[in-house]
Regions:
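ATP/NTP phosphate-donor binding region
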Residues: 1-92
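C-terminal charged capping/lid subdomain of soluble metabolic enzymes
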Residues: 3, 7-8, 174, 285-356
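Solvent-exposed alpha-helices and their adjacent loops that cap or buttress functional pockets
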Residues: 6-8, 33-34, 85-88, 109, ...
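A glycine/threonine-rich phosphate-anchoring loop and its flanking beta-alpha core
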Residues: 11-12, 110-206
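Short glycine/serine/threonine-rich phosphate/pyrophosphate-binding segments
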Residues: 24, 48-52, 100-106, 125-128, ...
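A short, small-residue-rich loop immediately preceding and capping a beta-strand
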Residues: 86-108, 112-121
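Active-site segments that bind and position negatively charged phosphate/pyrophosphate groups
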Residues: 197-306, 310
Length: 356
């Protein structure tokens, strides 16, 4: 018998808008989210304190508050252990903060077998809805498969309180989908890797909505579009069962920068934006590259290695090393298989084209 449908993991509740966090009590009262109405809240050690003061006024007094020092595997395991050993029997975990808190909480919730509600306070990357937790470990960092959040809340009032850089980074992150999708399609042609058409359509729609939007981070309409795009991008990974719709040569270059030059590493989305633009230029899609460069420039995002604080030779090192960060993944970098001297020439040409 033909398959009539397929099951797709997706959030039960999504709220995006100014003041959306005020709906959190009602969301947590939903029995699909929390059966008993007892929940723990994970926050960062820094800005999380002020967020606790803002949110605690509308939440029950018996909420358990837990701080997360950083997004490391050890801290995520420790968070799960502290919640498990708490006197109150919590049945839901709420993560309030940026990607680091949410990633640690996603991993902790998976260990505990709890649903997670993600309350994002910035728009730096698409991890808020993805089935992946990126955590620091002894080898540098690792990506861990976890269930996607059961609820997503993005309060644009809280987003506006974040440093602008943490919003702009999400623009670079979402534009990198266009590079990732081109790499996925390239792999399909060259290696026979299957492309999930629905996931690809979702990832492309997310990127195009930001690429074509004339507004900026000061516009509520643009923030709403960016928030929706990041949710859609994260969901595309859940549909595909892989990070392929959002991760290609762009993310390989990003991971290489993180590993080779950790003290110079910038925001994830900033590095992915530059990596995506370079890979698109390398692919020869110069029309799309010009569009991406214009959008990155308009939103005051990095475009060249020097904008990231890297010299040409350092960026060449990162591009040369990039394929080693994701063994088995086929992108334009693996396809061209350039020598270091060829990469050096390509980077010099890229800088000459896009330097401001």
């Amino acid at each position: 018998m033909a398959v009539l449908s397929r099951l797709i993991q997706a959030p039960a509740v999504v709220r995006v808008g100014a003041g959306a966090s005020t709906e959190l009590p009602a969301i947590l009262a939903d029995h699909r989210i929390s059966g008993s109405g007892t929940f723990a809240v994970a926050i960062s050690e820094g800005s999380g304190i002020s967020l606790r003061e803002q949110l605690s006024r509308s939440l029950p007094a018996d909420v358990g508050w837990f701080t997360v020092p950083r997004a490391s595997l050890d801290d995520a395991v420790d968070l799960a252990d502290r919640i498990r050993s708490a006197e109150a029997p919590y049945d839901t975990l709420v993560a309030v903060g940026g990607g680091k808190v949410i990633d640690a909480a996603k991993y902790a919730a998976a260990r505990l077998g709890m649903p997670l509600v993600a309350v994002a306070t910035n728009l730096a990357h698409d991890g808020l809805c993805s089935p992946v937790a990126t955590l620091a470990n002894d080898a540098g960092s690792g990506s861990y498969g976890v269930p996607s959040p059961i609820g997503i809340v993005i309060d644009l009032d809280l987003v506006r309180q974040a440093p602008p850089r943490f919003v702009r980074a999400g623009i670079g992150e979402i534009l990198s989908n266009l590079c990732a999708l081109a790499d996925w399609e390239l792999s399909h042609r060259e290696t026979g890797e299957q492309v999930d058409g629905l996931a690809a359509a979702m990832g492309r729609a997310a990127a195009e909505s930001v690429l074509r939007h004339p507004g900026g981070i000061g516009d509520e309409s643009f923030l709403a579009v960016l928030a929706d795009a990041l949710i859609l991008s994260g969901q595309s990974m859940a549909v595909a069962g892989t990070s392929r719709p959002s991760s290609g040569a762009c993310h390989e270059i990003n991971h290489a920068i993180d590993q080779l030059f950790p003290k110079q590493a910038q925001q994830h989305g900033e590095q992915c934006g530059v990596g995506a633009l370079f890979a698109t230029h390398l692919r020869g899609d110069l029309l799309l590259a010009a569009e991406m460069a214009e959008v990155l420039t308009r939103h005051e995002l990095p475009v060249t290695p020097s904008d990231l604080g890297l010299g040409i030779d350092q960026f060449v090192d990162a591009v040369t090393y990039a394929p080693q960060t994701r063994p088995g993944r086929y992108t334009i970098l693996e396809h061209l298989d350039l020598s270091r001297s060829e990469i050096h020439d390509a980077v010099k040409g890229y800088v000459a084209t896009y330097a401001r």
